[in-house]
């Protein structure tokens, strides 16, 4: 049964969507290793495509994902996203290392990421989304609770993805779990916060700032991130090797 699932729903790429002041850019990152026993994949995002400048070429983000039959669950994220629903702020600050964000910054504002699953048939249909225009910082904020009511966006008017989307919120909106409808499914939406200064919502991992003005070294980020166990794959070294 496991081999059938892996062959039918192959996790092949991570699609990153990041919004600039005047456009939305996409790039695909190939899978860097899979564990068929647990239906897991490690994916490394290095931000080397589209617009963005040198900071995108240096920033590296690692996802450990697991296919569950109903979609993909993000188990781990080297930028500090929680792998499970919780109230309040569920993620660390979202900007890459060394890059600050403010309401007046042109270019990079918020990062949104979607996980794609490819099979012989398109089993989920287009992912409907639309930027919500409620202010300068909220221009590119995609709210999960309005997903099913919004017109499609993305390349050629639609974007196909799994029923799990990680997206960044804005100051004042806060983090949280936003339910939405997609092809009869109920996807989960995890939100973290973009920030404009030190007074924004604190990151989940308080032992180190994972991005921004006092970004820790790679080893510190790794140490702060792995303080809770992975019930599906306890071998931490397999995952950590992709940080190097």
Curated annotation (Swiss-Prot):
Main subcellular location of this protein, as a coarse class: secreted
UniProt key word Ribosomal protein: no
Tissue specificity field: Expressed in salivary glands.
Keyword presence, Protein biosynthesis: no
Keywords from the UniProt entry: Cell adhesion impairing toxin, Hemostasis impairing toxin, Platelet aggregation inhibiting toxin, Secreted, Signal, Toxin
Subcellular location: Secreted
GO molecular function, one term: toxin activity
Signal peptide: 1-23
Superkingdom of the organism of origin: Eukaryota
Domain SCP: 67-194
Motif stretch (Cell attachment site): 143-145
A GO-annotated cellular component: extracellular region
Coiled-coil features, chain-numbered ranges: none
Function, as annotated: Inhibits platelet aggregation induced by all agonists tested (ADP, arachidonic acid, the thromboxane A2 analog U46619, thrombin, and snake venom snaclecs (TMVA that activates platelet through GPIB, and stejnulxin that specifically acts through GPVI (GP6))). May act by competing with fibrinogen for binding to glycoprotein IIb/IIIa (ITGA2B/ITGB3).
Family: Belongs to the CRISP family.
Name by which UniProt lists this protein: Tabinhibitin 8
The species this protein was found in: Tabanus yao (Horsefly)
